[in-house]
């Protein structure tokens, strides 16, 4: 089954985007599994060859739902020199960065050390991925900035990796996933938030991840489409946990980005949280303000995948609640549900809001002049 059918010649012929933009969700890939070996101690080479990796969702590496396309990516994104989509800097520049006038691209590497049962291996792989981002990507193209990937189930070790990268201009955020062993507000993850706040780094919470639990609240669904729709449900769970466990009271300077789960659900979640907090606030005395206030103050949102209601004023109502200053443009390149920059926004967006969404908000959040 092929999801994205545009041929490479068609993509190359598309008109270039004149507006300078930040793409806050780009997925780089390794050309081969061994591409990470130069950044790993030799003991891990032997370990990976003999035992491979064992994620929480089972004893085999890989997602439980096939993605309909290899790596969930566009068919036209295969590099001409070979390798998986997203593994070639030169082709990424030619197909995406240059024609779309991307002046800031935030890398979110997936299929890394997150979610591995062996915590020592997970930490080693995450550190290697961070070195790999510098060596292969950010040092070769100054437009690209990395995300500090951490083995988040070991909060203390993850915090050490964040502090190791603090102040390194190659990195602009910490990367977590939305599905973990426990909801993200749990105390096992607090060392990560403490270190991120110390480093002045926002945390990107990317939809996906496998903590060994069913991916819905009622079990395992039948279809990939259900997993896709379920990304927003999982992000809601993560965000409610962060607010109600008091993370933003404890770490008042911490900012987070909800990545690749839409944002149309944000107002209704805020309303429901506020209503229940008014009635049950004695259970959570550490939550000192209405939950929606924490969401509006501490949370940014990537546009991709943007909701597409029949009436665009409905979309604008949602954004007005969130705030135009809290939206970050993202394409999800090279994945199949990529948002075309020249077509993503409906008519009626003011020039000021358009500039903020495409570039200004990202520069402010990530401290890029």
Residue ranges with predicted function:
Residues 22-24, 205, 259, 330-331:
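Active-site flanking residues adjacent to catalytic metal/cofactor-binding acidic residues
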Residues 137-145, 150, 156, 161-321, ...:
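Catalytic pocket-lining loop regions of alpha/beta-barrel enzymes
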Residues 120, 124-136:
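Active-site-proximal gating segment of KS-fold condensing enzymes and close homologs
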Residues 28-32, 105-107, 113-119, 155-158, ...:
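Short catalytic/ligand-binding loop motif for oxyanion handling, primarily in non-cytosolic enzymes
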Residues 83-91, 126-131, 182-191:
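Aromatic- and glycine-enriched glycan-recognition loops and surfaces
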Residues 2-20, 30-99, 103-104, 131, ...:
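Mid-to-C-terminal alpha-helical segments outside catalytic/metal-binding sites
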């Amino acid at each position: 089954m092929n999801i994205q059918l545009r041929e490479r010649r068609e993509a190359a012929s598309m008109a270039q985007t004149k507006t300078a933009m930040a793409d806050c969700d780009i997925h780089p890939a390794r050309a081969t599994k061994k591409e990470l070996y130069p950044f790993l101690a030799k003991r891990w080479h032997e370990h990976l060859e003999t035992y491979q990796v064992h994620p929480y969702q089972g004893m085999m590496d890989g997602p439980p739902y096939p993605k309909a396309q290899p790596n969930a990516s566009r068919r036209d994104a295969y590099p001409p020199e070979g390798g998986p989509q997203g593994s070639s800097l030169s082709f990424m520049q030619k197909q995406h960065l240059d024609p779309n006038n991307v002046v800031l691209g935030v890398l979110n590497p997936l299929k890394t050390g997150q979610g591995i049962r062996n915590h020592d291996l997970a930490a080693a792989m995450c550190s290697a991925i961070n070195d790999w981002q510098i060596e292969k990507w950010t040092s070769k193209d100054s437009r690209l900035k990395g995300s500090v990937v951490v083995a988040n189930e070991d909060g203390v070790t993850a915090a050490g990796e964040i502090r190791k990268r603090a102040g390194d201009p190659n990195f602009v955020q910490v990367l977590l996933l939305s599905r973990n062993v426990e909801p993200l507000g749990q105390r096992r993850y607090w060392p990560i938030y403490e270190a991120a706040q110390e480093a002045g780094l926002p945390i990107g919470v990317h939809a996906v991840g496998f903590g060994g639990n069913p991916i819905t609240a009622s079990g395992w669904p039948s279809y990939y489409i259900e997993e896709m729709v379920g990304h927003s449900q999982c992000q809601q769970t993560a965000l409610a946990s962060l607010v109600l466990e008091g993370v933003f009271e404890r770490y008042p300077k911490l900012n987070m980005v909800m990545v690749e789960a839409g944002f149309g659900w944000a107002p209704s979640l805020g309303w429901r949280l506020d209503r229940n907090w008014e009635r049950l606030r004695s259970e959570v005395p550490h939550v000192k303000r209405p939950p929606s206030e924490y969401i509006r103050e501490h949370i940014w949102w990537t546009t991709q995948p943007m909701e597409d209601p029949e009436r665009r004023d409905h979309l604008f109502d949602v954004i007005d609640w969130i705030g135009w200053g809290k939206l970050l443009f993202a394409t999800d390149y090279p994945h199949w549900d990529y948002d075309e920059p020249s077509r993503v926004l409906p008519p009626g967006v003011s020039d000021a809001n358009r500039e903020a969404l495409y570039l200004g908000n990202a520069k402010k959040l990530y401290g890029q002049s």
